[in-house]
Amino acid sequence: MSGACTSYVSAEQEVVRGFSCPRPGGEAAAVFCCGFRDHKYCCDDPHSFFPYEHSYMWWLSIGALIGLSVAAVVLLAFIVTACVLCYLFISSKPHTKLDLGLSLQTAGPEEVSPDCQGVNTGMAAEVPKVSPLQQSYSCLNPQLESNEGQAVNSKRLLHHCFMATVTTSDIPGSPEEASVPNPDLCGPVP
């Protein structure tokens, strides 16, 4: 744009005479005519003159604000809808655990000594139709139980504390396996 601003009619319908840039008493760098068709001034940017009315820019600004507001409301509605659908999906699921098909239960709390940790000790389980004596295993060598006077090496006793794996089935007509103490003093082969 040039440094000469031509005369124009302002937004208040007043005629403003033309002037040249820079204006007397203004900045020396403001050598270009800037602004709009109804509002002109001097500035230092050669690309700041717009050939339409200043009020048009206000309508553009208001339109942009309305458009951004509508977009924000739509985005907010989408986020709220997604959150509600996720909540309904999660809350409508049943709160029951999955049935694995096995009915294993622990026989009771048994403490494992530090010497037995890291070896195959197994876990006792209750099996229907099996006597409690068959389910528990005393972890003691039967020969040592009968000879009370004999000194017992506790580490050696605990190393023979093994239990066979128990599996049961709810399928009608299938044989059930029961927990049976391992007669081998070294325990089952892993």
Swiss-Prot record:
What superkingdom heads the lineage? Eukaryota
Mind telling me which residue stretches traverse the membrane in this protein? 48-68, 70-90
Could you tell me the keywords of this UniProt record?
Membrane, Transmembrane, Transmembrane helix
Q: What is its main location?
A: membrane
- Tell me where in or outside the cell this protein is found: Membrane
Identify the GO cellular component terms for this protein. Answer: membrane
Classification via Pfam families: Shisa_N
Q: How does it sit in the membrane?
A: Multi-pass membrane protein
The answer, when asked if Transmembrane helix is one of the entry's keywords, is yes
Please give the family membership noted in the entry.
Belongs to the shisa family.
- Protein name (record): Protein shisa-like-2A
